[in-house]
Amino acid sequence: MGLCKCPKKKVTNLFCFKHRVNVCEHCLVSNHNKCIVQSYLQWLQDSDYNPNCSLCIQPLDSQDTVRLVCYDLFHWSCLNELASHQPLNTAPDGYQCPTCQGPVFPPRNLASPVADMLREQLSSVNWARAGLGLPLIEDPEEEETTTHSGTSFSEWSTFETTSVDVSMSNPTLTSLPPHQDGEHIYNNREQSAPNNTVFNMVTTSATDTVTISTVTSPRKLYDTRDLGHSAVMQIDFDDDKYRRRPALNWFAQVLKNCTSTKKKTLALKHRIFLLLLFGVIGFFTLIIIMAKFGRASAETDPNLDPLLNPNIRIGNM
């Protein structure tokens, strides 16, 4: 359990693996919507995380994300594509989290910022609106596509001249349609090769194709601060709160504060008071110990026994 640093100051067991801070659900939705967030106990077990989407093996920061009620994070386009391949008569319980097999739809009686954000995202697609009990929305009409079989060579020449005129006035940036590379995204779940994004840029001179490839790999984050400098400045870093400390660290801190030269008059009076207090306690402790041992030796001393003294006669009068 930890305390979130937001103005609400809520106690939470959620821990952001990227920023290494405790976060509540309000901060999770507003400031950590693309961060890996799980329980703090899981962070103590692993102390590592994978910043990539488990469906397409691409960084989570590259696209819009969706967080389920189990706090697993995916690309919204990947989860939508995966759920769209399910049969139309699939029950709401049939849509499960790809990681933990938990439910995709939040329970109806669950009221939390994460559940509200998830319902808002799911309400934008038909397969999820059916599971949420909402009416379906009409699909937008698909754009008309041209085919090579129904045109002649004269029509193609006319089309090429008109496309050049349009490109001179409004240059366009097009990409491959999502239905062509939808299967390629989910085939990469067992491969480590990155996806290639292809942009077709139409200009007046020629058609240039630019291929952008990004490769990322999860890496551990190490602390590169200067330990000597941070120990002198005594700055409260977030990582220091979760670092293991020796058992007598508090005693060393007290000695360091007592031996510090940058103390004011109030600190000097406090030190004198502590010395006097310890001296009085030690003095009374010594007196009690000496009195106890002295009384015990007097009780066993034969010289102090009146029955063993020849000068003292005790008898019947």
Swiss-Prot record:
Gene3D superfamilies reported for this sequence:
Zinc/RING finger domain, C3HC4 (zinc finger) (3.30.40.10)
This entry's Gene Ontology molecular function terms read: zinc ion binding
Q: Which residues lie on this side of the membrane: Lumenal?
A: 293-317
Q: Where are the zinc fingers (RING-type)?
A: 53-101
Could you tell me the Gene Ontology terms of the biological process aspect for this record?
vesicle-mediated transport
Q: How does it sit in the membrane?
A: Single-pass membrane protein
Q: Describe, by residue range, where the zinc fingers (B box-type) fall in the chain.
A: 1-43
Report the locations given in the UniProt record.
Golgi apparatus, cis-Golgi network membrane
Where is it predominantly found?
Golgi
Q: Where are the transmembrane segments?
A: 272-292
Keywords on record? ER-Golgi transport, Golgi apparatus, Membrane, Metal-binding, Transmembrane, Transmembrane helix, Transport, Zinc, Zinc-finger
One cellular component GO annotation, for this chain's record? Answer: membrane
Residues assigned to the Cytoplasmic compartment are 1-271
Name of the protein in its database record: Zinc finger protein-like 1
Q: Please report the organism this UniProt entry assigns to the protein.
A: Danio rerio
